[in-house]
Regions:
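Phosphate- and other anionic-substrate recognition elements at nucleic-acid/protein interfaces
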Residues: 1-124
Length: 124
């Protein structure tokens, strides 16, 4: 399949952790971050260091919101995707595989973002 987004990241977001899988032409790397602000800033720094251009995450409850709010200040295309649009693959049962699957779908341009209002509307 054709690569659409060569430098991308899939995030599997949970209450206490975020698993991030970065895919670049050089390869793939997965890291785990906690959800405290300090840790999310480390995630943002890592994405910048890897020169990521696109980031996708599932719209899991409210846990995606602090990550989205922090990353929207960077020069990234952010996608928050309905979990129903990320079809389950048999045997895909771990958080690491979830992050890799999201990154792979994003890499090939197979994800569509949900509508997220801009910051001023979200703060109303």
């Amino acid at each position: 399949m054709e690569v659409i987004n060569a430098r991308c990241c899939g995030l599997d977001v949970h209450k206490k952790t975020v698993l991030a899988c970065v895919m670049t032409p050089e390869g793939r790397e997965t890291r785990t971050f906690r959800t405290m602000t300090k840790d999310l800033l480390e995630l943002a720094d890592w994405l910048v260091e890897c020169r990521v251009t696109h980031v996708a995450m599932e719209s899991s409850g409210v846990f995606w919101k602090p990550i989205y709010n922090l990353l929207e200040g960077l020069d990234l295309t952010l996608l928050v995707v309905n979990a129903r649009h990320i079809k389950a693959v048999p045997g895909r049962k771990t958080d690491v595989k979830d992050a890799q699957w999201i990154a792979d779908l994003l890499r090939h341009g197979l994800l569509r973002s949900s509508y997220i209002p801009d910051r001023s509307q979200r703060e109303l």
